[in-house]
Amino acid sequence: MSRSTGGSDPHVLVIVQNLPIQVDRRVLLEFHELLARGYRVSLICPKGPGDPAREEIDGARIYKYRPAPEAKGLAGYALEFGYSWLRTAWLSLVAWREGGRFHVIQACNPPDTYWLLALLWRIRGVRFVFDHHDLNPELFLSRFGEPESRGQRLQFKGLKWLERMTFRAAHRVISTNDSYRAVAIRRGRREPRDVDVVRSGPDTTRMRPIYPSEPVPEGITMLAYIGIMGPQDGVDQVLDLVAELRRRGRTDVRATLMGFGDCLEDLKRQCTRQGLDDIVTFTGRVDKREIAEHMSRSHIGVCPDLKTPLNDLSTMNKSLEYMAYALPSVSFDLVETRVTGGDAISYVGSGDIAAMADEVEKLIDDPTRRAEMSRLARGRVVELFDWAGQAKVFGDVFDQVLGRPSAGERAPAPVPQDVDEWGRPYVPLDDDAEFERYVLERRAR
């Protein structure tokens, strides 16, 4: 499937504002698919801690800017978006000068502001693909409720206008699930043929259980959370869950919380107030190597996202990642989480911590059920959501936008390796007896 790459090959400029590229699994997979099809790729994103201003990842040029200060209030968000837009616009000029003309801009939201930059570049013949990651009007409703004051109504109308302009400016729209696709068609007034679903599926040939180098002590059950720690992510519910399990006398439960975000320090203070510092670990930002270690030693994943207008329609990457690592998980009952998890996830009513604790205890006390859900989880993510199937749809969008011949059939999947890139042995998923032993013990033999 790979095509030769050179200065005459089509050039895609990818724009991401809300995350450094190293922690945006979806966009990493996307631009590697473009590279595999012979596209040149430049990418603009904010810096993470200690990141350089320029780097190259597997042939893609990465341009980074210092992120804006943490936003507070309407003025703060306006400053953040304006600052990021201007830095991105400047770096797009740099990317054009250093990497040659680009033919497509792929803008990933939030925010819904880069349609204007795409229109400015359209005079140079650049086309625009909108990669629709978030529903910003629903995000507003989830954080603040229905707008009541004049200022809130103005903000809400502004978000809807920005979203509408983004849909209108795009030549094609890529949605993360069918709920988002329905929004693009209904609210964005896009033709169904112009909106494609590309789910944020993992590369399950690489995202799979390893034998952890530091398994948890025998008799201990490790809960895992992975994801952003913002106001809408419900990570405080994980702490409430752990506190409830301790109140019930479960001294055998620990929790590892992986990720970062605006609420991280508040969550650490909550953890201390609830007396959980001895059993809860906050890892902060983690890389692929650390994620594999923590997920492979954990027993149960937690999806604490409350039922809100945004969360109900969003696919939670954490649920897919738990499944890739053969973790059964517990979740509040959300429309798209059910689409993702099927019977591999236990669902309870939104905010019902007691019911979630009940489900965790059932999984701890019923090894047979835990093993069955682990097997279901891994099988479901491989069969329905593996990135290989999503990648073809994604790459075909760009080929069609530029009128390129289709890449045709994808190359056969690589032969599974016995070890990961750091030399750590994978769990043999085709050995039924060993797989069942592993998912119960989460350690090497």
Predicted feature locations:
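Acidic anion/phosphate-binding donor-loop and adjacent secondary structure
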Residues: S2, I185-R186, R193-D194, G201-E218, ...
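Conserved donor-binding/catalytic core segment of Leloir-type glycosyltransferases
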Residues: L13, P215-V242, T256
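Membrane-proximal helix-turn-helix segments that form the acceptor-binding/catalytic region
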Residues: H32, A89, L93, T113, ...
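Acidic donor-binding loop of glycosyltransferase active sites
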Residues: H171, M295-L313, L327
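Carbohydrate-associated surface elements
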Residues: S179, S200-G201
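Nucleotide-activated donor-binding/catalytic signature segment of Leloir-type glycosyltransferases, i.e.
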Residues: E265-A292, I300
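Conserved acidic donor-binding segment of nucleotide-sugar-dependent glycosyltransferases
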Residues: I345-A354, K362-T368
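A short, well-ordered alpha-helix in the C-terminal region of glycosyltransferases
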Residues: K362, R369-L384, V393-D396, A411
